From Swiss-Prot:
One of its GO terms (cellular component) is bacterial nucleoid. Pfam families: RecO_C, RecO_N. This is DNA repair protein RecO. SUPFAM superfamilies: ArfGap/RecO-like zinc finger, Nucleic acid-binding proteins. One of its GO terms (biological process) is double-strand break repair. It comes from the Bacteria. Keywords: DNA damage, DNA recombination, DNA repair. Transmembrane segments: none annotated. Disulfide bonds: none annotated. Involved in DNA repair and RecF pathway recombination. Belongs to the RecO family.
Length: 255
């Protein structure tokens, strides 16, 4: 059985296999999403026992089939304890990768954005701009991101200095007011310019709602209309812990 070269990776999800093992879904730098069999990982003294989401790992595996065997998993940094909202945000980005990417389809640029998202999630809890950036970069890497630079009907471009609102329609792109389609989401021109750019700085808080709605609708098209479990859990958590009037606001920041 061939041992593959090592790779940097993050755990997206794992579930039991047999009495002592785990099936682990990894997001790796060179292979993209990779499923591996972690033999004996459920034993308390196993070297693989600390595998969990949110930990950067250096991994090696044996074999090239659909489910190679995990041979080594070394921690590359400390695991930072996350609060419930941070955990739900981590679950959210991991669920997007699990639902929308295929195994062994590498996305090195997206891997870097994923790591930047985890860093921001730990250092800026409660802010949602890095999730919007991840969503947009995911769509771009998968070839699904619509053109945000021009009106899909007339070709006019949004002006960041303008207070004008544009219209966003999932799977079709953006439209100026003169060509507004039905069932579209209003979004600030400056927010569109930010969304199609590098997105290295925070978005304006006033954009949170429109950015979230636009990207949520776009993602739902590719999720086959089947909602994400992480969104359901976020709403349930906020209903238990926050007054009803703050739920929408916290959703806009956290997802």
């Amino acid at each position: 059985m061939t041992t593959e070269p090592g790779d940097r990776a993050w755990v997206l999800h794992h579930y039991p296999y047999g009495d002592t093992s785990l099936i682990v879904e990894l997001f790796t730098r060179t292979q993209g999403r990779l499923g591996v069999l972690a033999k004996g990982a459920r034993r308390a003294r196993s070297a693989l026992a600390r595998i969990e989401a949110g930990r950067p790992l250096w991994v090696r595996w044996l074999g090239r089939g659909e489910l190679p065997v995990l041979a080594q998993a070394e921690e590359l940094g400390p695991f930072l304890p996350l609060n419930p909202l941070q955990n739900l945000s981590l679950f959210y980005v991991n669920e997007l990768l699990l639902r929308l990417t295929q195994r062994r389809d590498p996305f090195p640029d997206l891997f870097q954005v994923y790591e930047e998202t985890i860093d921001a999630l730990c250092s800026e809890p409660g802010e949602g701009w890095y999730l919007r950036r991840f969503e947009r970069r995911l769509l771009e890497n998968l070839g699904w991101a619509p053109d945000l630079a021009h009106c899909a009907e007339c070709g006019r471009s949004p002006d960041a200095a303008s207070s004008e609102h544009w219209l966003y329609q999932a799977a079709h792109g953006v439209f100026c007011r003169a060509h507004a389609p039905d069932a579209a989401v209003a979004i600030e021109a400056a927010a569109l310019v930010w969304l199609r750019g590098a997105m290295q700085t925070r978005s304006m808080p006033v954009w949170n709602s429109s950015l979230r709605r636009c990207l949520e609708q776009e993602l739902l098209v590719h999720l086959g209309g089947r909602p994400l479990e992480s969104r359901r859990l976020l709403t349930a958590y906020l209903r238990r812990t926050q007054p009803a009037m703050t739920i929408q606001k916290r959703e806009e920041h956290s997802e």
